[in-house]
Curated annotation (Swiss-Prot):
This is Ribonuclease pancreatic. The keyword RNA-binding does not apply. Belongs to the pancreatic ribonuclease family. Endonuclease that catalyzes the cleavage of RNA on the 3' side of pyrimidine nucleotides. Acts on single-stranded and double-stranded RNA.
């Protein structure tokens, strides 16, 4: 099966491309990365930075996760990301997404050995 670290990479890493202003980016990527099977995932963020840079976030600023767990970390620098959001009225199997390129600090949950990202928690404008 797929490990949580592998799932994180499948759902959130797109190192090879820069943030796309193409309105079809999310429709293509959500399908390509198997997030429209059985249901449409409502919100998903892709990170356009080298994997090692995202893995390094696990050793940056420690923050509390949205669910109250304490294994989340915020990136020291802003990263290029694309936010995909299911459009209103979009119904499975016709999953349609809005595409928003952004530059933000990311917050990830990390676990395991090696200690790597396993969950994308949030993205924030500033470093506070």
């Amino acid at each position: 099966g797929e490990s949580r670290a592998e799932k994180f990479q499948r759902q959130h890493m797109d190192s090879g491309s820069s943030p796309s202003s193409s309105s079809t980016y999310c429709n293509q990527m959500m399908k390509l990365r198997n997030m429209t099977q059985g249901s449409c995932k409502s919100v998903n963020t892709f990170v356009h930075e080298p994997l090692v840079d995202v893995q390094n976030v696990c050793f940056q600023e420690k923050v509390t996760c949205k669910n109250g767990q304490t294994n989340c970390f915020k990136s020291n620098s802003r990263m290029h990301i694309t936010e995909c959001r299911l459009t209103n009225g979009s119904k499975y199997p016709n999953c349609a997404y809005g595409t928003s390129p952004k530059e933000r600090h990311i917050i990830v949950a990390c676990e395991g050995s090696p200690y790597v990202p396993v969950h994308f928690d949030d993205s924030v404008e500033d470093s506070t």
